[in-house]
């Protein structure tokens, strides 16, 4: 698993998924570092590493379905669904008022155990919102897992990488000024 995490960090840095500047995160917080997992997940090899890493972390967990919130979690949840042969549900950020008018694509059945997938966790509010929606459907949350945990939530979420891992790796491959 360590080799996979190292390879994932390296590739995310290579494709420019670790950005430095002044950013406003979805939580509203400001940050000097932005982890663009959405960009990273457009590369098939990275998406495969993510799904392999998550599948390895979840292999001993009993669950029935994978859930995510649009947009960032979708490619990750789809890849994990294919890898683990589990159905998935995608929660919309907002209920649509046209077509089927639903707040989700797919279903959650009463009594199911569901894994919630996220791209990046900052405060955890998006993941916890998805978890609430799972529970409101009569199912239970088996786990919440993210590609990157920014380590700002005060909670111990399951993740493949911590923000500090990415920054440390980035700093170790940057030339130092004399």
Curated annotation (Swiss-Prot):
Single GO BP term: 'de novo' UMP biosynthetic process
Entry EC number(s): 2.4.2.10
Database matches in CDD domains: PRTases_typeI
Reactions that this protein is recorded to catalyse: orotidine 5'-phosphate + diphosphate = orotate + 5-phospho-alpha-D-ribose 1-diphosphate
Binding residues for orotate: 122, 150
A GO molecular function held by the record: magnesium ion binding
UniProt xrefs under InterPro entries: OPRT, Or_phspho_trans_dom, PRibTrfase_dom, PRTase-like
Cofactor list: Mg(2+)
UniProt: 5-phospho-alpha-D-ribose 1-diphosphate binding residues: 92-93, 96, 118-126
Family statement drawn from the similarity comment of this UniProt entry: Belongs to the purine/pyrimidine phosphoribosyltransferase family. PyrE subfamily.
Function: Catalyzes the transfer of a ribosyl phosphate group from 5-phosphoribose 1-diphosphate to orotate, leading to the formation of orotidine monophosphate (OMP).
Oligomer status and interactors: Homodimer.
UniProt-recorded name of the protein: Orotate phosphoribosyltransferase
Gene, per the UniProt record: pyrE
